[in-house]
């Protein structure tokens, strides 16, 4: 968050684009205010291998595998060639991960209870 305030330009990637009324209904969930954002891009699964709460889980198996990969420069180069430079875009990356990983990262829906913040 602090990096966004210090940046000259901020391109925000979002799991979901929602109406302004949704954001205003719970402003405490806004991490980066619009005043510092230059562009917003809809990029599902952009947090992988990390998680996006309510969308998908943390890919712990990825992090364990990365520990091994990152032990050598050659293995790291091979990984980057395959998974970063070797995919056309984020969608191709997600498809390359495959259905088994997609399924493993699914999280059950658990809606929060409404809270009255008053009119904003």
Could you describe each region identified by the protein language model?
Residues 1-120:
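Metallocofactor- and cofactor-centric catalytic cores in central/energy metabolism, strongly enriched
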């Amino acid at each position: 968050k602090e990096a966004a305030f210090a940046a000259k330009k901020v391109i925000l990637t979002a799991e979901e684009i929602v109406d302004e009324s949704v954001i205003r209904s719970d402003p405490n969930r806004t991490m980066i205010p619009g005043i510092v954002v230059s562009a917003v891009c809809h990029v599902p699964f952009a947090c992988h291998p990390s998680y996006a709460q309510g969308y998908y889980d943390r890919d712990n198996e990825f992090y364990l595998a990365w520990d091994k990969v990152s032990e050598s420069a050659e293995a790291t180069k091979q990984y980057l060639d395959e998974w970063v430079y070797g995919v056309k875009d984020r969608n191709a990356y997600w498809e390359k991960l495959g259905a088994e990983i997609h399924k493993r990262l699914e999280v059950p829906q658990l809606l929060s209870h409404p809270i009255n913040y008053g009119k904003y």
